Amino acid sequence: MNKETFYSYLGRFLAFPMVADTIIKLAKRRVYSHIHNGAYMERYWLLREGSWLSRTLGIAIRLHVINSNDGDRAMHTHPFKFRTFILKGGYWERRRYDDFGYDVGVERVPGDTYEMDIKDAHQIYRLLDGPATTLFVYGARKDDWYFETEHGMIPHEQYLKTNGGY
């Protein structure tokens, strides 16, 4: 079985209501930080970045409850490679693949999983029927967050400062 097939089966398993509800209940005991007091996104730890186990495995795991789309914010990258598992809800995502340089619209529903590299840009532009709850598994930080603008890729601090923050 190849890696993507394994992750596909794992994603479907994690989205079973009893499994997803257990993960959510465990994660909600450990708040990481919320963006806009949770109006945009709630974030919780399952495997805290920097912990002994996280350093040993080379990953950290958070639960994200996405309560709002990215609005008019530009497409953005992340400073690490990550994999997301959709547990509940869902969304439409715009993706820019660095290798190909074109946009793709993708619907994400419970059971779906995908990986993003640090150079891939994305934007969540529509939620499906309420919040989307995801398991967010990421590796070591290798770069900064960037937002894609007509002036090129802008570091997130600069972009957020000039565009009203999150």
Identify the meaning behind each predicted range.
Residues 53-59, 81-82, 94, 109, ...:
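Beta-sandwich/jelly-roll carbohydrate-recognition scaffolds of carbohydrate-active enzymes
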Residues 62-77, 118:
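Conserved short histidine dyad/triad with adjacent acidic residue
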Residues 95-123:
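Short acidic-glycine-tyrosine-enriched beta hairpin
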Residues 2-58:
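A short, N-terminal "cap"/entry segment at the start of jelly-roll beta-barrel domains
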Residues 53-55, 71-78, 106, 125-127:
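Short histidine-centered beta-strand/loop micro-motifs
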Residues 144-166:
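Active-site or metal-binding loop neighborhoods of secreted/extracellular toxin and effector enzymes
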Residues 117-144:
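Ligand-binding loop in jelly-roll beta-barrel domains
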Residues 77-93:
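Short, conserved beta-strand element in jelly-roll/cupin
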